[in-house]
Amino acid sequence: MATASRPLRLVQISDIHCGEPTFDAKAMDSMIERTNEIEPDLVLVVGDLTAAGYEWEFAEAAEWLSQIEADKVIVPGNHDARNVGYLHFEHHFGDRFSSYRKAFEPDRAEELGSTGFTVVAVDSSEPDLNDGQIGRERYAWIRDQFTEPNDIKIFAIHHHLVAIPGTGRERNTINDAGDVLAELIHLGVDLVVSGHKHVPYFWGISGLLICNSGTPTTKRLRGLTPPSWTEIEVNEIAINAYLHYDDRRRELACVRHRETRTMVREGFYITDAFLMSNHLLPLPSRGERPTS
């Protein structure tokens, strides 16, 4: 009896902020241990490895990430571009714009309906600014990286392409977000992974699944948002995203159907209490309790 091929498994982390006073080494150890247990095909590290872009912070981040026993694609975030930190990023991690492709073995390709997977990773940061952009001079390069029409296509970026609830003033999308979204949808990209504001959230837009990750290793948390990181599983039917929490819970966050390119399940831990803590719902009357 033939055994089922293994799904494509990815781990997405962001905003570890080495050098931050609230950096939690125990949480980092736990995340690395659990990531190695998952044995992902690839780990996507989508920015803000450091607190202020200093060389010693990058060295610390590199030491931590070297303990993950999987290939990695890493992009810088806005904190990493502070203090000319992008030079230290390049020294420790290589190009700020990169692509990665892995072909599937024949049995796995047949079962997953894809020849392999391609990741295109871009630097959306601007030195010493919190906002960012990609820039139209990069669009042709992005198109040229997605050369395999039957690959699972993944785009990695630090900043948001779509506003995320509960993140404050919506100045966190890149300046050319609309143009970039149009390019990615035209290219048939399946998945966007991003970070930035420490709030995990999931959007489905014109067939594109956008996974925004939280922070797994600091106490810089908004409202009632707990520390978390994301596991993404692509099987023959769907893309499933799971949130991992620091108490070792693993929770299904969203499901996107591959054939119809539509979201089947949305929402996860965001409760009325979370929404109220971020002023997205009115506070309950005295004596009432928010829904959890």
Description of each model-found segment:
Residues 149-166:
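Short acidic, glycine-rich surface-loop motifs adjacent to enzyme active sites
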Residues 19-22, 51-56, 78-87, 127-130, ...:
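Active-site environment of divalent metal-dependent phosphoester hydrolases
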